[in-house]
Curated annotation (Swiss-Prot):
Secretion signal, residue range per the UniProt entry: none
Cross-referenced NCBIfam families: SigBFG, sigma70-ECF, Sigma_B
PROSITE patterns: SIGMA70_1
UniProt protein name: RNA polymerase sigma-B factor
Entry GO MF terms: DNA binding; sigma factor activity
Length: 257
């Protein structure tokens, strides 16, 4: 097929153009090129959760569904890179699948109901903001206090599997019961935690300046001008560093399979 002869090494501009083509015209070729370009990223993320076990192929398929969802939902008009939106979307689909497959204990109705609303709010706000929402934004969206949101997220964490490695190991011998225990402090939204989980190993490829630029732009949501002022460099320099850092992260993710 002609589509297979297309190069997979796409620039940021190529990616945005293909996403726009797919969203506007439902172009199958554009979608195939995007999937071909990002399939190694999906494989890398999937392996972090499957460790090559019996669920590996299923997790890859779920990750691909997450990628397709990210392609459909990404707002290219904002101009942010696609990867910081796609990674938590893919991870979220995989973790939801694993929770649904392995969560075999009773969860109080209030936690289940409000936990579901919080999860939906995070997804809606991520689509709207094109970044992970803060606790106060989730609370405002649901008409709750920050304390209530934190309470529900913390309570829900006490019912979640403590390690996804345990889930996969149990699944390999047919068991559906995973080890349950309390898991640490609540982050500012599930998606930030998931993004850090995926990026923690590959983030070390960046130097300190690159790490700072990525932190200010994607975690603190500063624009390039304000980021430059924080670091004492020009806006143009920030733009160059951001492109370089994202390129390094993509290469590290694609090679870590």
């Amino acid at each position: 097929m002609e589509i297979q002869s297309q190069p997979t090494n796409l620039t940021k501009e190529d990616v945005i153009k293909l996403i726009a083509e797919f969203q506007q015209n439902q172009c199958g070729e554009a979608q195939e090129r995007l999937v071909d370009h990002y399939k190694n990223l999906v494989y890398s993320i999937a392996y972090r959760y499957s460790k090559g076990g019996p669920m590996h192929e299923d997790i890859i398929q779920v990750g691909m569904l997450g990628l397709l969802g990210a392609i459909r939902r990404y707002d290219y008009s904002i101009g942010n890179a696609f990867e910081p939106f796609a990674i938590p979307t893919i991870v979220g689909e995989i973790k939801k699948y694993l929770r649904d497959k392995t969560w075999g204990i009773h969860v109080p109705r209030r936690i289940k109901d409000l936990g579901g609303k919080i999860k939906l709010a995070i997804e809606e706000l991520t689509d709207h903001l094109q970044r992970s929402p803060k606790i106060i934004e989730i609370a405002d969206h649901l008409g709750l206090s920050e304390e209530e949101v934190l309470e529900i997220m913390d309570a829900k964490n006490n019912y979640r599997v403590s390690s996804l490695d345990d889930v996969v190991e149990n699944a390999s011998d047919g068991s559906s019961v995973a080890r349950i225990e309390s898991v640490g402090e609540v982050e500012q939204g599930y998606e930030q935690t998931e993004r850090r989980l995926v990026l923690k190993d590959i983030f070390n490829v960046l130097n300190e300046t690159e790490k700072s630029v990525i932190h200010y732009i994607f975690e603190e949501n500063l624009n390039q001008k304000d980021t430059g002022e924080r670091l004492g460099i020009s806006q143009m320099h920030v733009s160059r560093i951001k492109r370089q850092a994202i390129s390094k992260l993509k290469q590290a993710a694609f090679l870590d399979t």
